[in-house]
Regions:
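Walker A (P-loop) phosphate-binding loop of ABC-type ATPase nucleotide-binding domains
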Residues: 37-42
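Conserved ABC transporter NBD signature motif
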Residues: 27, 58-73
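Helix-to-loop junction immediately C-terminal to a conserved catalytic motif
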Residues: 51
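Catalytic Walker B motif of ABC-type/P-loop ATPase nucleotide-binding domains
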Residues: 151-155, 160
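ABC transporter nucleotide-binding domain
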Residues: 168-257
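C-terminal coupling/interaction segments
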Residues: 242, 246-296
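ABC-family P-loop ATPase nucleotide-binding domains
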Residues: 82-138
Length: 296
């Protein structure tokens, strides 16, 4: 099966800065991917490359088996929702929705209308007069109702309150079940979307440092909690991603443990606690940043 997206050694430089650095990934059809990483990690630049909005400095990109750059046949199958989207000054919400079918062959006007009601949007208000949350909601509606085979959401929640964000997640998951496609979701609110994501791509300093199914990641690290001496003895010789403590109590984040190692930890009086996806991302990017600093 040909992947929806395939890149090899993809790089985008701005002067001496490599915003995307040697990225090689393959994304399959009909999966929800999380593209995670802190600000400036390269998420938006990578998505811009994959949607033909940026030119690569070097490396190869294939989207639906061919280059996306200036390729109408590919781009009509792609929807990229980003915070910086611009519209003509006189455009109202209704104009955005009316023009959408020109760009997205699978556009569902009935679904779009239902979402407008869900988000309580004023159709006759100009885009430039919308609140940040309303502006984001319009993007969410376009991304969902486009039903594009490949849909990117770049920080779609900006300005949305908790209720509106949950509405987005619920509608995304329900519509994905009925109309499967490949969705790439970039967000900082990782724990909110953790149950949506089937696969995680973690980018840091322009490099992909994690490319794995979400279920596999959930058990890849664990917190070892207990007295300082006992934790130090147990973690001796292991890679410790993070460690902190209060008084004599210490928590150390370590890589996957075998069943025998888990038993040994408990026999030593240590407690093992799960690490959330958000904590995992933080720990891994901290670890990678430390490696970069040490090699500099």
């Amino acid at each position: 099966m040909t992947p929806v997206i395939h890149t090899r050694d993809l790089t985008r430089r701005y002067g001496s800065l490599a915003a995307v650095n040697g990225v090689s990934i393959s994304l399959d059809e009909n999966r929800i991917y999380g593209l995670l990483g802190r600000n400036g990690a390269g998420k938006t630049t990578l998505m811009s490359l994959l949607t033909g909005q940026e030119f690569a400095t070097s490396g190869d990109i294939e989207v639906f088996g061919t280059s996306p750059v200036e390729n109408a046949a590919v781009l009509q199958r792609v929807c990229f929702i980003k915070e910086s989207q611009r519209y003509p000054d006189d455009f109202k919400i209704k104009h955005v929705l009316r023009s959408a079918p020109w760009f997205f062959p699978n556009w569902d006007p009935d679904f779009a209308a239902a979402l407008v009601t869900d988000f309580n949007l004023p159709l006759n208000r100009k885009m430039k007069k919308l609140s940040r949350g309303q502006f984001s909601a319009v993007g969410v509606i376009v991304g969902l109702a486009s039903r594009a085979p490949l849909t990117f959401f770049d920080e779609p929640y900006l300005g949305l309150d908790a209720v509106a964000r949950q509405l987005f997640y619920d509608r995304l998951l329900a519509d994905y079940a009925d109309h499967p496609r490949t969705v790439v979701l970039s967000t900082h609110l990782i724990d909110e979307v953790a149950d949506l994501l089937e696969h995680v791509l973690l980018i840091d300093a322009g490099r992909i440092i994690v490319d794995a199914p979400t279920d596999e990641l959930r058990g890849s690290v664990v917190n070892v909690v207990g007295g300082r001496d006992a934790v130090d003895r147990f973690t001796a010789g292991r890679e410790v991603l993070h460690s902190d403590g209060i008084g004599g109590l210490v928590s150390a984040t370590v890589s996957r443990l075998t069943d025998a190692e888990r038993t040994a930890a408990r026999d030593a009086g240590l407690e093992l606690t799960a690490v959330s996806l958000q904590q995992l991302v933080v720990r891994l990017t901290e670890s990678t940043n430390n490696e970069f600093q040490e090699s500099a």
